From Swiss-Prot:
Similarity comment text for this entry: Belongs to the P4HA family.
EC number: 1.14.11.2
GO BP term, pick one: collagen fibril organization
Name recorded for this polypeptide: Prolyl 4-hydroxylase subunit alpha-1
Signal peptide per UniProt: 1-17
Cofactor note: Binds 1 Fe(2+) ion per subunit.
InterPro entries for this protein: Oxoglu/Fe-dep_dioxygenase_dom (IPR005123), P4HA-like (IPR045054), Pro_4_hyd_alph (IPR006620), Pro_4_hyd_alph_FE2OG_OXY (IPR044862), Pro_4_hyd_alph_N (IPR013547), TPR-like_helical_dom_sf (IPR011990), TPR_rpt (IPR019734)
Compartments where found: Endoplasmic reticulum lumen
Binding positions for 2-oxoglutarate per the UniProt entry: 510
Chemical reaction(s) catalysed: L-prolyl-[collagen] + 2-oxoglutarate + O2 = trans-4-hydroxy-L-prolyl-[collagen] + succinate + CO2
Amino acid sequence: MIWGVLMMGILLPQCSAHPGFFTSIGQMTDLIHNEKDLVTSLKDYIKAEEDKLEQIKKWAEKLDRLTSTATKDPEGFVGHPVNAFKLMKRLNTEWSELENLILKDMSDGFISNLTIQRQYFPNDEDQVGAAKALFRLQDTYNLDTNTISKGNLPGVKHKSFLTAEDCFELGKVAYTEADYYHTELWMEQALMQLEEGEMSTVDKVSVLDYLSYAVYQQGDLDKALLLTKKLLELDPEHQRANGNLVYFEYIMSKEKDANKSASGDQSDQKTTPKKKGIAVDYLPERQKYEMLCRGEGIKMTPRRQKRLFCRYHDGNRNPKFILAPAKQEDEWDKPRIIRFHDIISDAEIEIVKDLAKPRLSRATVHDPETGKLTTAQYRVSKSAWLSGYEDPVVSRINMRIQDLTGLDVSTAEELQVANYGVGGQYEPHFDFARKDEPDAFRELGTGNRIATWLFYMSDVSAGGATVFPEVGASVWPKKGTAVFWYNLFASGEGDYSTRHAACPVLVGNKWVSNKWLHERGQEFRRPCTLSELE
Protein backbone atom coordinates (compact mmCIF):
# COMPACT_ATOMS: atom_id res chain seq x y z
CA MET A 1 0.00 0.00 0.00
CA ILE A 2 1.25 3.48 -0.76
CA TRP A 3 -0.01 5.24 2.33
CA GLY A 4 -1.06 8.75 1.48
CA VAL A 5 -1.27 7.71 -2.18
CA LEU A 6 -3.29 4.52 -2.00
CA MET A 7 -5.50 4.33 1.07
CA MET A 8 -7.85 1.51 1.98
CA GLY A 9 -11.35 2.66 2.82
CA ILE A 10 -14.06 0.85 4.69
CA LEU A 11 -17.36 2.63 4.47
CA LEU A 12 -20.03 1.68 6.96
CA PRO A 13 -23.65 2.66 6.36
CA GLN A 14 -24.94 5.59 8.35
CA CYS A 15 -26.40 4.40 11.63
CA SER A 16 -29.97 5.44 12.23
CA ALA A 17 -31.56 6.04 15.61
CA HIS A 18 -31.28 2.74 17.39
CA PRO A 19 -31.75 1.34 20.88
CA GLY A 20 -28.08 0.28 21.15
CA PHE A 21 -28.33 -3.37 22.19
CA PHE A 22 -24.61 -3.60 23.00
CA THR A 23 -25.04 -1.30 26.01
CA SER A 24 -27.34 -3.69 27.92
CA ILE A 25 -26.94 -7.42 28.54
CA GLY A 26 -30.57 -7.52 29.69
CA GLN A 27 -31.83 -6.39 26.30
CA MET A 28 -29.38 -8.62 24.45
CA THR A 29 -31.04 -11.66 26.03
CA ASP A 30 -34.20 -10.73 24.10
CA LEU A 31 -32.18 -11.06 20.89
CA ILE A 32 -31.37 -14.67 21.81
CA HIS A 33 -35.09 -15.49 21.96
CA ASN A 34 -35.73 -13.63 18.70
CA GLU A 35 -32.97 -15.59 16.98
CA LYS A 36 -34.36 -18.85 18.36
CA ASP A 37 -37.76 -17.99 16.82
CA LEU A 38 -36.05 -17.33 13.49
CA VAL A 39 -34.23 -20.66 13.64
CA THR A 40 -37.56 -22.42 14.26
CA SER A 41 -39.06 -20.56 11.29
CA LEU A 42 -36.04 -21.50 9.16
CA LYS A 43 -36.40 -25.18 10.08
CA ASP A 44 -40.09 -25.03 9.14
CA TYR A 45 -39.09 -23.60 5.77
CA ILE A 46 -36.49 -26.35 5.24
CA LYS A 47 -39.11 -28.99 6.13
CA ALA A 48 -41.56 -27.46 3.64
CA GLU A 49 -38.90 -27.48 0.92
CA GLU A 50 -38.01 -31.10 1.73
CA ASP A 51 -41.70 -32.12 1.58
CA LYS A 52 -42.02 -30.33 -1.76
CA LEU A 53 -38.93 -32.09 -3.15
CA GLU A 54 -40.25 -35.43 -1.87
CA GLN A 55 -43.49 -34.91 -3.82
CA ILE A 56 -41.53 -34.00 -6.96
CA LYS A 57 -39.31 -37.08 -6.54
CA LYS A 58 -42.39 -39.33 -6.31
CA TRP A 59 -43.76 -37.73 -9.49
CA ALA A 60 -40.46 -38.29 -11.25
CA GLU A 61 -40.21 -41.94 -10.16
CA LYS A 62 -43.80 -42.67 -11.24
CA LEU A 63 -43.38 -40.99 -14.62
CA ASP A 64 -40.01 -42.65 -15.15
CA ARG A 65 -41.58 -46.09 -14.72
CA LEU A 66 -44.54 -45.17 -16.92
CA THR A 67 -42.53 -43.69 -19.79
CA SER A 68 -40.03 -46.57 -19.67
CA THR A 69 -42.88 -49.01 -20.28
CA ALA A 70 -44.58 -46.82 -22.89
CA THR A 71 -41.46 -46.25 -25.01
CA LYS A 72 -40.93 -49.99 -25.48
CA ASP A 73 -44.15 -50.23 -27.55
CA PRO A 74 -45.60 -46.75 -28.09
CA GLU A 75 -48.36 -47.80 -30.50
CA GLY A 76 -49.45 -50.72 -28.41
CA PHE A 77 -49.38 -48.57 -25.26
CA VAL A 78 -51.59 -45.77 -26.58
CA GLY A 79 -53.74 -48.31 -28.36
CA HIS A 80 -55.19 -49.07 -24.97
CA PRO A 81 -58.03 -46.55 -24.44
CA VAL A 82 -57.27 -46.10 -20.74
CA ASN A 83 -53.60 -45.34 -21.46
CA ALA A 84 -54.65 -42.89 -24.17
CA PHE A 85 -56.99 -41.08 -21.76
CA LYS A 86 -54.37 -40.97 -18.99
CA LEU A 87 -51.73 -39.64 -21.39
CA MET A 88 -54.04 -36.77 -22.37
CA LYS A 89 -54.86 -36.14 -18.72
CA ARG A 90 -51.20 -36.13 -17.65
CA LEU A 91 -50.02 -33.77 -20.34
CA ASN A 92 -53.01 -31.45 -20.11
CA THR A 93 -53.53 -31.36 -16.35
CA GLU A 94 -50.96 -33.17 -14.23
CA TRP A 95 -47.83 -31.62 -15.74
CA SER A 96 -49.39 -28.21 -15.12
CA GLU A 97 -49.95 -29.21 -11.49
CA LEU A 98 -46.32 -30.32 -11.25
CA GLU A 99 -45.21 -27.01 -12.74
CA ASN A 100 -47.25 -25.13 -10.14
CA LEU A 101 -45.73 -27.24 -7.36
CA ILE A 102 -42.19 -26.54 -8.58
CA LEU A 103 -42.91 -22.82 -8.90
CA LYS A 104 -44.54 -22.62 -5.47
CA ASP A 105 -42.40 -20.43 -3.18
CA MET A 106 -42.14 -22.13 0.20
CA SER A 107 -40.09 -19.25 1.64
CA ASP A 108 -42.96 -16.77 2.00
CA GLY A 109 -43.60 -17.54 5.67
CA PHE A 110 -39.93 -17.44 6.61
CA ILE A 111 -39.23 -14.23 4.65
CA SER A 112 -42.27 -12.57 6.22
CA ASN A 113 -41.09 -13.52 9.73
CA LEU A 114 -37.54 -12.41 8.95
CA THR A 115 -38.78 -9.05 7.67
CA ILE A 116 -40.73 -8.46 10.88
CA GLN A 117 -37.82 -9.48 13.12
CA ARG A 118 -35.20 -7.54 11.15
CA GLN A 119 -36.53 -4.19 12.37
CA TYR A 120 -35.41 -5.26 15.88
CA PHE A 121 -31.98 -6.50 14.75
CA PRO A 122 -28.75 -4.88 15.92
CA ASN A 123 -27.19 -2.48 13.44
CA ASP A 124 -23.65 -1.36 12.60
CA GLU A 125 -23.51 0.74 15.77
CA ASP A 126 -24.13 -2.37 17.86
CA GLN A 127 -21.57 -4.48 16.01
CA VAL A 128 -18.93 -1.76 16.29
CA GLY A 129 -19.86 -1.16 19.94
CA ALA A 130 -19.48 -4.86 20.78
CA ALA A 131 -16.12 -4.97 18.99
CA LYS A 132 -14.83 -1.90 20.82
CA ALA A 133 -16.01 -3.48 24.07
CA LEU A 134 -13.74 -6.46 23.35
CA PHE A 135 -10.83 -4.05 22.82
CA ARG A 136 -11.67 -2.34 26.11
CA LEU A 137 -11.73 -5.66 27.98
CA GLN A 138 -8.50 -6.68 26.29
CA ASP A 139 -6.73 -3.55 27.53
CA THR A 140 -8.26 -3.34 31.00
CA TYR A 141 -7.69 -6.97 31.93
CA ASN A 142 -4.42 -7.50 30.03
CA LEU A 143 -5.87 -10.22 27.80
CA ASP A 144 -4.00 -11.31 24.69
CA THR A 145 -5.90 -11.93 21.46
CA ASN A 146 -5.28 -15.69 21.56
CA THR A 147 -6.85 -15.97 25.02
CA ILE A 148 -9.98 -14.19 23.81
CA SER A 149 -10.05 -16.12 20.53
CA LYS A 150 -9.85 -19.46 22.34
CA GLY A 151 -12.56 -18.37 24.78
CA ASN A 152 -10.33 -18.83 27.84
CA LEU A 153 -11.98 -16.13 29.95
CA PRO A 154 -12.39 -16.39 33.74
CA GLY A 155 -15.81 -17.40 35.02
CA VAL A 156 -17.26 -18.42 31.65
CA LYS A 157 -20.05 -21.02 31.53
CA HIS A 158 -20.35 -21.20 27.76
CA LYS A 159 -16.99 -21.32 26.01
CA SER A 160 -17.01 -19.58 22.64
CA PHE A 161 -14.31 -19.38 19.97
CA LEU A 162 -13.44 -16.72 17.42
CA THR A 163 -12.76 -17.81 13.85
CA ALA A 164 -10.11 -16.23 11.65
CA GLU A 165 -12.95 -14.37 9.93
CA ASP A 166 -14.17 -13.05 13.32
CA CYS A 167 -10.65 -11.83 14.15
CA PHE A 168 -10.41 -10.21 10.71
CA GLU A 169 -13.72 -8.39 11.27
CA LEU A 170 -12.52 -7.13 14.67
CA GLY A 171 -9.36 -5.86 13.00
CA LYS A 172 -11.43 -4.06 10.36
CA VAL A 173 -13.53 -2.33 13.04
CA ALA A 174 -10.33 -1.12 14.72
CA TYR A 175 -9.02 0.04 11.34
CA THR A 176 -12.21 2.01 10.65
CA GLU A 177 -11.77 3.73 14.02
CA ALA A 178 -8.11 4.51 13.14
CA ASP A 179 -7.15 2.27 16.07
CA TYR A 180 -4.07 0.74 14.46
CA TYR A 181 -2.84 -0.82 17.69
CA HIS A 182 -5.83 -3.16 17.89
CA THR A 183 -5.88 -3.54 14.11
CA GLU A 184 -2.41 -5.04 14.32
CA LEU A 185 -3.28 -7.34 17.23
CA TRP A 186 -6.39 -8.81 15.62
CA MET A 187 -4.98 -9.08 12.10
CA GLU A 188 -1.99 -10.94 13.54
CA GLN A 189 -4.38 -13.30 15.34
CA ALA A 190 -6.33 -13.89 12.11
CA LEU A 191 -3.07 -14.56 10.25
CA MET A 192 -1.88 -16.98 12.94
CA GLN A 193 -5.11 -18.99 12.78
CA LEU A 194 -4.95 -19.13 8.97
CA GLU A 195 -1.33 -20.30 9.10
CA GLU A 196 -2.38 -23.01 11.54
CA GLY A 197 -4.60 -24.38 8.77
CA GLU A 198 -8.01 -23.01 9.73
CA MET A 199 -10.42 -23.02 6.79
CA SER A 200 -11.89 -19.57 6.24
CA THR A 201 -13.50 -17.28 3.70
CA VAL A 202 -10.77 -14.77 4.57
CA ASP A 203 -7.44 -15.11 2.75
CA LYS A 204 -3.94 -14.26 3.96
CA VAL A 205 -3.51 -11.57 1.31
CA SER A 206 -6.42 -9.51 2.70
CA VAL A 207 -5.14 -9.91 6.26
CA LEU A 208 -1.58 -8.90 5.31
CA ASP A 209 -2.94 -5.90 3.42
CA TYR A 210 -4.50 -4.47 6.60
CA LEU A 211 -1.71 -5.67 8.87
CA SER A 212 1.11 -4.02 6.94
CA TYR A 213 -0.80 -0.72 6.95
CA ALA A 214 -1.48 -0.87 10.70
CA VAL A 215 2.18 -1.61 11.40
CA TYR A 216 3.30 1.23 9.13
CA GLN A 217 0.95 3.69 10.86
CA GLN A 218 2.59 2.81 14.18
CA GLY A 219 6.02 3.65 12.81
CA ASP A 220 7.49 0.16 12.34
CA LEU A 221 8.69 0.56 8.75
CA ASP A 222 10.91 -2.55 8.81
CA LYS A 223 8.04 -4.81 9.80
CA ALA A 224 5.68 -3.14 7.33
CA LEU A 225 8.20 -3.83 4.54
CA LEU A 226 8.60 -7.45 5.66
CA LEU A 227 4.82 -8.00 5.69
CA THR A 228 4.45 -6.37 2.27
CA LYS A 229 7.07 -8.73 0.82
CA LYS A 230 5.24 -11.65 2.41
CA LEU A 231 2.01 -10.47 0.76
CA LEU A 232 3.74 -10.27 -2.64
CA GLU A 233 5.01 -13.83 -2.28
CA LEU A 234 1.36 -14.89 -2.15
CA ASP A 235 0.12 -12.45 -4.79
CA PRO A 236 2.96 -11.02 -6.94
CA GLU A 237 0.48 -8.96 -9.01
CA HIS A 238 -1.06 -7.16 -6.03
CA GLN A 239 -1.11 -3.57 -7.30
CA ARG A 240 -1.27 -1.77 -3.95
CA ALA A 241 1.43 -3.94 -2.36
CA ASN A 242 3.79 -3.42 -5.31
CA GLY A 243 3.31 0.33 -5.06
CA ASN A 244 3.86 0.29 -1.33
CA LEU A 245 7.00 -1.81 -1.62
CA VAL A 246 8.54 0.94 -3.74
CA TYR A 247 7.29 3.60 -1.32
CA PHE A 248 8.60 1.83 1.81
CA GLU A 249 12.02 1.24 0.26
CA TYR A 250 12.16 4.90 -0.77
CA ILE A 251 11.33 6.07 2.77
CA MET A 252 13.89 3.71 4.30
CA SER A 253 16.54 4.92 1.86
CA LYS A 254 15.83 8.54 2.84
CA GLU A 255 16.09 7.66 6.54
CA LYS A 256 19.45 5.94 6.03
CA ASP A 257 20.81 8.94 4.15
CA ALA A 258 19.58 11.25 6.92
CA ASN A 259 21.28 9.10 9.56
CA LYS A 260 24.58 9.12 7.66
CA SER A 261 24.58 12.88 7.31
CA ALA A 262 23.66 13.45 10.94
CA SER A 263 26.43 15.22 12.83
CA GLY A 264 28.34 13.54 15.64
CA ASP A 265 29.73 10.08 16.03
CA GLN A 266 26.89 7.67 16.78
CA SER A 267 29.24 5.52 18.82
CA ASP A 268 29.91 8.43 21.19
CA GLN A 269 26.25 8.94 21.94
CA LYS A 270 25.09 7.74 25.32
CA THR A 271 22.04 5.55 25.47
CA THR A 272 19.21 6.84 27.55
CA PRO A 273 18.68 4.52 30.52
CA LYS A 274 15.28 2.92 30.86
CA LYS A 275 13.02 4.42 33.44
CA LYS A 276 12.63 2.47 36.61
CA GLY A 277 9.25 1.29 37.77
CA ILE A 278 6.99 4.06 39.02
CA ALA A 279 5.28 3.76 42.39
CA VAL A 280 1.62 2.83 42.07
CA ASP A 281 0.57 6.03 43.86
CA TYR A 282 2.05 8.15 41.07
CA LEU A 283 0.72 6.27 38.06
CA PRO A 284 -1.65 8.17 35.76
CA GLU A 285 -5.29 7.69 36.66
CA ARG A 286 -6.04 5.40 33.70
CA GLN A 287 -3.35 2.93 34.73
CA LYS A 288 -4.45 2.98 38.37
CA TYR A 289 -8.05 2.46 37.29
CA GLU A 290 -7.17 -0.57 35.15
CA MET A 291 -4.93 -2.05 37.85
CA LEU A 292 -7.71 -1.75 40.41
CA CYS A 293 -10.15 -3.38 37.98
CA ARG A 294 -7.76 -6.34 37.82
CA GLY A 295 -7.55 -6.50 41.60
CA GLU A 296 -4.04 -5.05 41.67
CA GLY A 297 -2.71 -1.74 42.89
CA ILE A 298 -2.65 -0.06 46.27
CA LYS A 299 -3.05 -2.32 49.30
CA MET A 300 -4.25 -0.97 52.62
CA THR A 301 -1.70 -1.25 55.44
CA PRO A 302 -2.44 -3.68 58.31
CA ARG A 303 -2.67 -0.70 60.67
CA ARG A 304 -5.45 0.85 58.58
CA GLN A 305 -7.16 -2.50 58.12
CA LYS A 306 -7.46 -2.83 61.89
CA ARG A 307 -9.68 0.25 61.87
CA LEU A 308 -12.23 -1.47 59.60
CA PHE A 309 -15.04 -3.30 61.38
CA CYS A 310 -18.21 -5.29 60.80
CA ARG A 311 -21.20 -4.40 62.95
CA TYR A 312 -24.96 -4.59 63.33
CA HIS A 313 -26.60 -1.25 62.57
CA ASP A 314 -30.04 -0.36 63.94
CA GLY A 315 -30.40 3.00 62.17
CA ASN A 316 -29.96 4.96 65.40
CA ARG A 317 -32.55 2.93 67.32
CA ASN A 318 -34.97 2.86 64.40
CA PRO A 319 -37.87 0.55 65.36
CA LYS A 320 -37.61 -1.25 62.01
CA PHE A 321 -34.07 -2.40 62.76
CA ILE A 322 -33.99 -2.94 66.52
CA LEU A 323 -34.98 -6.62 66.32
CA ALA A 324 -33.37 -7.25 62.93
CA PRO A 325 -30.44 -4.84 62.57
CA ALA A 326 -28.68 -4.39 59.24
CA LYS A 327 -25.31 -6.03 58.66
CA GLN A 328 -22.73 -3.32 58.07
CA GLU A 329 -19.11 -3.68 56.93
CA ASP A 330 -16.41 -1.03 56.49
CA GLU A 331 -14.93 -1.35 52.99
CA TRP A 332 -12.60 1.68 53.21
CA ASP A 333 -11.64 4.33 55.74
CA LYS A 334 -10.95 7.53 53.75
CA PRO A 335 -13.34 8.14 52.14
CA ARG A 336 -15.49 6.02 54.36
CA ILE A 337 -17.21 3.40 52.21
CA ILE A 338 -19.75 1.17 53.97
CA ARG A 339 -21.29 -2.02 52.63
CA PHE A 340 -24.69 -3.25 53.84
CA HIS A 341 -25.20 -7.00 53.48
CA ASP A 342 -28.52 -8.75 52.68
CA ILE A 343 -30.17 -5.36 52.39
CA ILE A 344 -32.37 -6.06 49.36
CA SER A 345 -34.13 -9.37 48.70
CA ASP A 346 -34.13 -11.39 45.48
CA ALA A 347 -37.88 -10.79 45.15
CA GLU A 348 -37.41 -7.01 45.44
CA ILE A 349 -34.58 -7.14 42.91
CA GLU A 350 -36.74 -8.95 40.35
CA ILE A 351 -39.58 -6.44 40.77
CA VAL A 352 -37.19 -3.50 40.31
CA LYS A 353 -35.68 -5.14 37.20
CA ASP A 354 -39.12 -5.92 35.74
CA LEU A 355 -40.19 -2.30 36.26
CA ALA A 356 -37.00 -0.98 34.65
CA LYS A 357 -36.61 -3.31 31.65
CA PRO A 358 -39.32 -1.82 29.40
CA ARG A 359 -37.86 1.67 29.67
CA LEU A 360 -34.12 1.03 29.67
CA SER A 361 -32.35 3.60 27.50
CA ARG A 362 -28.75 4.60 26.95
CA ALA A 363 -27.35 5.98 30.20
CA THR A 364 -26.51 9.68 30.21
CA VAL A 365 -24.09 11.98 32.02
CA HIS A 366 -24.21 15.66 32.96
CA ASP A 367 -22.48 17.82 30.36
CA PRO A 368 -20.44 20.31 32.43
CA GLU A 369 -20.75 22.97 29.72
CA THR A 370 -24.50 22.81 29.11
CA GLY A 371 -25.66 21.27 32.39
CA LYS A 372 -27.84 18.92 30.35
CA LEU A 373 -27.87 15.13 30.11
CA THR A 374 -26.07 13.53 27.19
CA THR A 375 -24.68 10.12 26.20
CA ALA A 376 -20.94 9.52 26.42
CA GLN A 377 -18.51 6.84 25.23
CA TYR A 378 -17.06 6.55 28.73
CA ARG A 379 -20.40 5.36 30.10
CA VAL A 380 -21.60 2.14 28.46
CA SER A 381 -24.85 0.98 30.04
CA LYS A 382 -28.61 1.46 29.92
CA SER A 383 -30.64 2.93 32.71
CA ALA A 384 -34.17 3.73 33.81
CA TRP A 385 -35.58 5.91 36.57
CA LEU A 386 -38.15 4.58 39.04
CA SER A 387 -40.35 6.75 41.24
CA GLY A 388 -41.54 5.69 44.68
CA TYR A 389 -45.13 6.28 43.50
CA GLU A 390 -44.90 3.54 40.87
CA ASP A 391 -44.69 0.51 43.11
CA PRO A 392 -44.73 -0.17 46.87
CA VAL A 393 -41.38 -1.98 46.55
CA VAL A 394 -39.64 1.14 45.22
CA SER A 395 -41.18 3.24 48.00
CA ARG A 396 -40.10 0.67 50.58
CA ILE A 397 -36.53 0.65 49.24
CA ASN A 398 -36.39 4.46 49.38
CA MET A 399 -37.52 4.48 53.01
CA ARG A 400 -34.96 1.78 53.86
CA ILE A 401 -32.21 4.04 52.52
CA GLN A 402 -33.53 6.93 54.63
CA ASP A 403 -33.75 4.80 57.77
CA LEU A 404 -30.21 3.44 57.43
CA THR A 405 -28.44 6.64 56.37
CA GLY A 406 -30.44 9.08 58.47
CA LEU A 407 -30.75 11.31 55.39
CA ASP A 408 -33.97 12.69 53.94
CA VAL A 409 -34.82 10.96 50.63
CA SER A 410 -37.65 13.36 49.73
CA THR A 411 -35.10 15.62 47.99
CA ALA A 412 -33.15 12.73 46.48
CA GLU A 413 -33.22 11.80 42.81
CA GLU A 414 -35.40 8.90 41.72
CA LEU A 415 -34.00 5.40 41.95
CA GLN A 416 -31.80 4.84 38.90
CA VAL A 417 -31.57 1.25 37.65
CA ALA A 418 -28.67 0.39 35.33
CA ASN A 419 -27.79 -2.68 33.30
CA TYR A 420 -24.32 -2.90 31.81
CA GLY A 421 -23.72 -4.32 28.34
CA VAL A 422 -20.73 -5.96 26.65
CA GLY A 423 -17.70 -4.51 28.40
CA GLY A 424 -20.11 -2.17 30.20
CA GLN A 425 -18.37 0.49 32.25
CA TYR A 426 -18.46 4.00 33.64
CA GLU A 427 -14.99 5.54 33.59
CA PRO A 428 -13.66 7.65 36.52
CA HIS A 429 -16.04 10.45 37.45
CA PHE A 430 -17.43 12.43 40.38
CA ASP A 431 -21.04 12.11 41.47
CA PHE A 432 -21.08 15.65 42.87
CA ALA A 433 -20.90 18.90 40.91
CA ARG A 434 -17.61 20.79 41.16
CA LYS A 435 -17.25 24.54 41.58
CA ASP A 436 -16.84 24.99 37.82
CA GLU A 437 -20.24 23.30 37.31
CA PRO A 438 -22.58 25.63 39.23
CA ASP A 439 -25.58 24.80 37.04
CA ALA A 440 -25.28 20.99 37.13
CA PHE A 441 -28.31 20.41 39.39
CA ARG A 442 -29.96 23.84 39.28
CA GLU A 443 -33.10 22.43 37.63
CA LEU A 444 -33.63 20.08 40.59
CA GLY A 445 -33.35 22.90 43.11
CA THR A 446 -32.09 20.52 45.81
CA GLY A 447 -28.41 21.43 45.96
CA ASN A 448 -25.46 19.17 45.31
CA ARG A 449 -25.30 15.38 45.62
CA ILE A 450 -24.34 14.90 49.24
CA ALA A 451 -24.13 11.09 49.17
CA THR A 452 -24.43 7.98 46.97
CA TRP A 453 -26.23 4.73 47.78
CA LEU A 454 -25.52 1.87 45.35
CA PHE A 455 -27.37 -1.48 45.30
CA TYR A 456 -25.74 -4.50 43.65
CA MET A 457 -28.60 -6.47 42.12
CA SER A 458 -26.56 -9.27 40.55
CA ASP A 459 -23.35 -11.18 40.98
CA VAL A 460 -20.80 -10.71 38.19
CA SER A 461 -18.71 -13.66 37.00
CA ALA A 462 -15.65 -11.52 36.24
CA GLY A 463 -14.94 -7.78 36.33
CA GLY A 464 -17.48 -5.08 37.14
CA ALA A 465 -15.89 -3.74 40.33
CA THR A 466 -16.51 -0.22 41.65
CA VAL A 467 -13.08 1.35 42.07
CA PHE A 468 -11.77 4.59 43.56
CA PRO A 469 -8.47 5.38 41.74
CA GLU A 470 -7.55 8.32 44.00
CA VAL A 471 -7.31 6.10 47.08
CA GLY A 472 -6.94 2.59 45.64
CA ALA A 473 -10.23 1.11 46.86
CA SER A 474 -11.96 -1.72 44.98
CA VAL A 475 -15.51 -2.79 45.86
CA TRP A 476 -16.67 -5.98 44.15
CA PRO A 477 -20.32 -6.65 43.21
CA LYS A 478 -22.24 -8.99 45.49
CA LYS A 479 -25.93 -9.53 44.90
CA GLY A 480 -28.19 -8.26 47.69
CA THR A 481 -25.64 -5.82 49.11
CA ALA A 482 -25.34 -2.03 48.89
CA VAL A 483 -22.52 0.45 49.39
CA PHE A 484 -22.80 3.99 50.72
CA TRP A 485 -20.45 6.96 50.83
CA TYR A 486 -20.59 10.73 51.26
CA ASN A 487 -19.60 12.81 48.22
CA LEU A 488 -19.40 16.03 50.24
CA PHE A 489 -17.73 16.84 53.51
CA ALA A 490 -20.04 18.10 56.26
CA SER A 491 -18.86 21.59 55.31
CA GLY A 492 -20.43 21.17 51.88
CA GLU A 493 -17.08 21.00 50.10
CA GLY A 494 -16.61 18.18 47.59
CA ASP A 495 -14.56 15.15 48.63
CA TYR A 496 -12.33 14.59 45.60
CA SER A 497 -11.19 11.21 46.92
CA THR A 498 -14.65 9.86 46.01
CA ARG A 499 -13.81 9.94 42.29
CA HIS A 500 -14.81 6.45 41.21
CA ALA A 501 -15.52 4.21 38.24
CA ALA A 502 -17.46 1.09 37.26
CA CYS A 503 -14.98 -1.37 35.74
CA PRO A 504 -15.88 -3.11 32.48
CA VAL A 505 -17.91 -6.30 32.89
CA LEU A 506 -15.62 -9.06 31.61
CA VAL A 507 -18.05 -11.98 31.94
CA GLY A 508 -21.62 -11.89 33.21
CA ASN A 509 -24.54 -9.54 33.64
CA LYS A 510 -24.35 -6.55 35.97
CA TRP A 511 -27.47 -4.93 37.41
CA VAL A 512 -27.22 -2.05 39.88
CA SER A 513 -29.50 0.66 41.20
CA ASN A 514 -28.44 3.84 42.90
CA LYS A 515 -29.90 6.71 44.86
CA TRP A 516 -28.26 10.11 44.80
CA LEU A 517 -29.16 12.06 47.95
CA HIS A 518 -29.02 15.86 47.81
CA GLU A 519 -28.16 18.62 50.30
CA ARG A 520 -31.64 20.08 50.80
CA GLY A 521 -33.41 18.60 53.78
CA GLN A 522 -30.19 17.45 55.45
CA GLU A 523 -29.50 20.68 57.37
CA PHE A 524 -30.34 19.13 60.75
CA ARG A 525 -29.64 15.52 59.79
CA ARG A 526 -26.02 16.26 58.86
CA PRO A 527 -25.16 19.70 60.26
CA CYS A 528 -22.50 21.80 58.58
CA THR A 529 -19.09 22.02 60.29
CA LEU A 530 -16.66 24.93 60.45
CA SER A 531 -13.75 22.87 59.13
CA GLU A 532 -13.61 22.71 55.33
CA LEU A 533 -12.45 19.08 55.16
CA GLU A 534 -14.65 17.49 57.83
